[in-house]
A protein has these predicted regions:
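Bacterial N-terminal signal peptides that target proteins for export
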Residues: 1-9
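C-terminal motif of bacterial Sec signal peptides marking the signal peptidase cleavage site
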Residues: 16-19
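Lipolytic serine-hydrolase domain surface
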Residues: 21, 25-109, 117-118, 125-126, ...
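Alpha/beta-hydrolase fold active-site loops
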Residues: 130
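The conserved beta1-alpha1 loop
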Residues: 133-137, 213, 248
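Short substrate-entry loop that stabilizes the transition state in hydrolases
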Residues: 140-145
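Gly/Ala-rich beta-loop-alpha elbow adjacent to hydrolase catalytic centers
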Residues: 192, 212-216, 220
Length: 375
């Protein structure tokens, strides 16, 4: 590695470290009694991580498992008056304070039949049949992903059943951890494909949406590619997988073109969230031969503008939503009240992701700073 690249890596790792600096070193998934006035978010997790043998609060490690495991976690979130919406409030020390911190009320290992029963029970109890599958990115421990999904669902008030697909990221900020995570992403595409097949087969599930972040987009797009090829060969139609949201995708833009081509016209509707000031993706671009990453393209420039429109991909350019000190890589989640909530509203109204007009886009209230493409 050249000296300039080494410096860039160190700077970028320091930048990304700030996003995780508040989390405790040990796992936080130890059951603790909640208190009145907090919100409880159930998370149903599916993973191909190994079970943790060293930290009971971790549940699952960053090592790869040969089999898929399941878990059910209930996360307590403090009142909005006691927290900054769009962020996870990590406890400074365990067990934490439920009045100000995210906390775990219950965390259980479950089997596949109980997972299916839990989804059915959640659908019946809430009257909801829409499932949101979250696929996290690089540098995520199991509890990172659990708390982030709980925050997204809570802050967006999304009317969904939250399912976490968490793949074996080591949750470390080292270059070799990045390459390990990338190979883990490759390792996990079949497991995600199987989960999507399983969810869409449930009679209790009416619709599935996937929300992928960063390197999780690679897992997602590869799983979608595999499903599309297999479904096309089998003649499968009327898939319940309707929408896919690609947030800051750490994916080679040339590879994305080939993935789209293999998916064909019967693929799910797609929306893309990009930021041209994303330092994490700038680092990734340098590592992977200076080829643009899908998450940092300028959708107003050719050939992207025409390609995205031709493929009916709705694009949200979040670059100009920048605030001093914010993390561009997580911007869509931190601006959750304006971005994810808008998507939630569209889903609740039964509209497709590309049926909106800029004139009625709630984000135009921010000064017409979001680009939307598609037709």
């Amino acid at each position: 590695m050249t000296r300039n690249l080494t410096v860039l890596v160190l700077v970028a790792l320091a930048f990304m470290l700030a996003a995780c600096a508040g989390r405790p070193a040990q796992g936080v998934l130890i059951s603790t009694a909640g208190i009145a006035g907090t919100s409880l978010v159930p998370i149903y997790a599916v993973t191909n991580r190994e079970r943790s043998t060293t930290d009971p609060g971790e549940m699952f490690s960053g090592e790869r498992a040969a089999e898929t495991s399941y878990a059910a976690i209930a996360v307590s979130i403090p009142p909005d008056t006691a927290r900054k919406v769009g962020e996870v409030q990590w406890p400074a020390s365990l067990p934490g304070n439920p009045a100000t911190d995210f906390m775990t009320v219950s965390a259980d290992y479950i089997d596949k039949p109980r997972f299916a029963a839990s989804i059915a029970a959640a659908a019946k109890q809430s009257g909801r049949s829409k499932v949101l599958v979250f696929v996290h990115g690089f540098n995520n421990r199991f509890d990172d992903a659990v708390y982030r999904l709980a925050q997204i669902v809570h802050d967006s008030r999304s009317p969904v059943i939250p399912v976490l697909f968490t793949w074996p990221s080591r949750g470390e900020l080292r270059l070799r951890a990045y390459t390990y995570d990338r190979e883990s992403a490759n390792y996990s595409r079949d497991a995600l494909e199987s989960l999507l097949d399983m969810l869409t087969s449930y009679s209790s599930v009416g619709e599935v949406t996937v929300l992928a972040h960063s390197m999780g987009n690679w897992v997602t797009l590869e799983a979608l590619r595999g499903r599309a090829i297999r479904n096309r060969l089998a003649g499968t139609k009327n898939d319940k997988l309707k929408d896919v949201m690609l947030v800051a995708p750490d994916v080679d833009v040339d590879v994305f073109r080939t993935q789209l081509q293999r998916m064909g016209v019967a693929r799910p509707r797609m929306s893309l969230f990009v930021s041209q000031d994303d330092d994490a993706l700038a680092l990734s671009r340098t590592i992977w031969g200076d080829v643009p990453r899908l998450g940092d393209v300028n959708p107003q420039l050719e050939p992207y503008r025409t390609e995205l429109a031709d493929n009916r991909i709705t694009v949200y350019d979040l670059t100009h939503l920048a605030k001093p000190g914010d993390d561009a890589h997580d911007r869509a989640f931190e601006d959750v009240t304006s971005v994810v909530a808008m998507i939630r509203q569209r889903m609740a109204q039964g509209q497709t992701m590309r049926e909106h007009r800029a004139i009625d886009n709630p984000l135009t209230q921010l000064g017409d700073r979001v680009t939307t493409l598609g037709r």
